[in-house]
Amino acid sequence: DITAIEQLKKLDGPIIILSHQGLAEQWSIDNAKEIQEILKSHQDKIIMTLNGHNHIDHIIKIGSIINFHINSASYKWVGGDHRHKSYSDTIHSKFPYIEYTCPYKDPLYTTVTINPSSKNIEIKGIMSEWVGKSPAQIGQEIHPGLSDGKEVCPHIRTRRVKRS
């Protein structure tokens, strides 16, 4: 979007970019490399990007920009090839799309704190567990570079991320 690029040029910072789909690495937008080149030229004022489309707990740094893939509040989508039952037949008949997910027992959420002077980031974690089987247990392949139980998991890890 040309307007967003123009805004990047005008703003002094600090900037946090929120998007539904990721701007870096696993399952990112189609033109992620092009977007990363634009963002890299403004990395002195961009603290982080934050997205949740992938339902993973993952951080990747590109230059000094922290790209945080935040986990979903309630489940990991596994799709039609991995349909299964995590709850009773009554629940599944009332909510038919739940069979396409690996749900979490408890909702996930986090607090992200940014130090205004250092621009370092602190992420407060929260743990849950799978209701039924995990994506790995039902045979869903994990994207290269991600680990079952680490990035593909029912939690958000506590982290302190230093901006370089």
Residue ranges: model-predicted function:
Residues D1-N67, H155:
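His/acidic metal-ligating clusters that form di-metal
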Residues H58-S164:
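Binuclear metal-dependent phosphoesterase catalytic core
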